[in-house]
Amino acid sequence: MLTYHRLEQKPQPKSPEKPWLLVLLALVWLWTGIVGRDLWRSEEIQLYAYIKAILHNEHWLLPTLYHVPYLNSSPFYLWWGALSQWFLNGLLGISPRFAVQLLTLMVMSINFLLLGLAGRGFLGFRQGRVTVSIIIGCIGIVILGHQISPLPFLLLSLSIYSYVLSRYHKWPILAAGFTLGVAWALAFYIANFPIVFFLVILSLLLLAHQQWCNRHYILVLLVAFAFFLPLISLWIGAMRISYPLYLHLWFVTNSGFIYFLPSLPKLAAHAFYYVKNLSWYAFPAWILALIAIIKVKSLLYRDKNYFLFCCWIVFGFIYII
């Protein structure tokens, strides 16, 4: 007797893919670069010293090391490093240095998860695994993912941003806007104003595409601004009250806009240097991106996701320079 099954109810053939192999690869990739490793770069030693100084002198708002304040960015990363050291070392007995390195491991794990979900949201089922595999294979991520550095948190903000854009149309406006605002605020606390400026411009540029220019997305952006501005005002306001001179010094040295126009001739003269390094650190992702652009060039503007990808590439290159 023949039995009719609707298409969605028909039994699907078992996939030969094994997702647990990707999880195992990610765990091996993360752990082998952290366990038993000394601090390689001077930036790692400096950040680790500031983290220890926070726990010693309890200057949380403006960490200082031998009376030298930390003004590279907000102390957001140092706060998390100090909290991880206090919890893992003080309560679990893990060595202080390894406790801070574990923070990098946990943040990179969240990055892989969010980027995989973003890849699935943009490109469809099973494409998230491909996204994570490509990211793990990039040479630059090997350096980024195994050091005591605020850069994994910057990648976390970009991962959250990408994930929200891939799912915003399925989320309530308030939830999507809040998460997008948190991503912007996290980027600000790690890398100051320039990265937020580029993310906001990118978000607004998407409105030039008819599929992005809709009521839901516009309301998400408005809600994101409504949450983003108060979030960044917390640290700025506290610094203005307690350390106004250091706040001014931080703004002058890290805003980026003051030195942008005078440095344009210098950037043009060293364009080859930046292109060379970017091509090395982004290998092999940039080759795959170039092949994809050639294959789907007719969809670059018609499809909203491909339009976003092209904007990402252009703005990412400009920001790195």
Locate predicted features.
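Start-transfer (signal-anchor) and selected internal transmembrane alpha helices
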Residues: M1-W31, L219-F227
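Extracytosolic helix-loop segments that constitute the early lumenal/periplasmic catalytic or substrate-binding loops
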Residues: V28-W29, L47-N72, F76, L83-W86
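Transmembrane-lumen/periplasm boundary regions of multi-pass, lipid-linked membrane glycan transferases
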Residues: Y50-A53, Y189-I190, I195-I321
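Transmembrane-helix motifs of polytopic, lipid-linked glycan transferases
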Residues: F98-F122, I160
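Membrane-interface transmembrane helices that cradle and orient dolichyl/undecaprenyl
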Residues: R120-R126, Y161-T179, A183-A187
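Short helix- or helix-capping micro-motifs
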Residues: T131-I136, W184
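Short acidic/glycine- and proline-prone juxtamembrane loop motifs at membrane-interface regions
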Residues: G140-L154, A191-F193
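Membrane-interface alpha helices of multi-pass inner-membrane proteins
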Residues: V142-I143, A175-N192, G316-I321
